[in-house]
């Protein structure tokens, strides 16, 4: 009657040499996703995932730690060269890029893909701090 223990499947190593790093830097958090050329995610990380809470998530250091984590996971799958796509107005844009270089990737292109409206919806009211 006793159930046999379930085997945990190990994630297979993808053998990919080049990829695209999508850095989404918002005002509240920074998310780094490394994909292959088709857009299938290889690894991802964020400042919140790395244990930063509240306003500390939006710091450049939190973005650096998140990019470092995502980069190390992608390097295990054999990624060597990256194109970087940066999106958003956050403070973690440059530090995430530097962290990816520090991991040891050769960065071939840096693109800013922040969506800019051609006068879209009305913005929210101004903050009074």
UniProtKB/Swiss-Prot annotation:
Record's GO cellular component terms: ribonucleoprotein complex; ribosome
Record has Transmembrane as a keyword: no
GO terms, molecular function: rRNA binding; structural constituent of ribosome
One Pfam family named in its UniProt record: Ribosomal_S11
GO terms, biological process: translation
PROSITE patterns named among the record's database cross-references: RIBOSOMAL_S11 (PS00054)
Swiss-Prot/TrEMBL keywords: Ribonucleoprotein, Ribosomal protein, RNA-binding, rRNA-binding
The UniProt record lists the keyword Iron: no
Xref: PANTHER family: 40S RIBOSOMAL PROTEIN S14/30S RIBOSOMAL PROTEIN S11 (PTHR11759)
HAMAP family: Ribosomal_uS11
NCBIfam families assigned to the protein according to its UniProt record, in alphabetical order: PRK05309.1, uS11_bact
Summary of subunit composition and partner proteins: Part of the 30S ribosomal subunit. Interacts with proteins S7 and S18. Binds to IF-3.
Function of the protein: Located on the platform of the 30S subunit, it bridges several disparate RNA helices of the 16S rRNA. Forms part of the Shine-Dalgarno cleft in the 70S ribosome.
Family as reported in the entry's similarity comment: Belongs to the universal ribosomal protein uS11 family.
Protein name: Small ribosomal subunit protein uS11
């Amino acid at each position: 009657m006793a159930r046999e223990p379930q085997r945990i499947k190990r994630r297979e190593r993808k053998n990919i040499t080049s990829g695209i790093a999508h850095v989404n830097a918002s005002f509240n958090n920074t998310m780094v996703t490394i994909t292959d050329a088709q857009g299938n995610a290889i690894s991802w990380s964020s400042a919140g995932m790395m244990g930063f809470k509240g306003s500390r998530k939006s710091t450049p250091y939190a973005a650096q730690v998140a990019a470092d984590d995502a980069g190390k996971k992608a390097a295990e799958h054999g990624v060597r060269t990256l194109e970087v796509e940066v999106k958003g107005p956050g403070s973690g844009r440059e530090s995430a890029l530097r962290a990816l270089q520090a991991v040891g990737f050769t960065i071939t292109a840096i693109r800013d893909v922040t969506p800019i409206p051609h006068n879209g919806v009305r913005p929210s009211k101004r903050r009074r701090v």
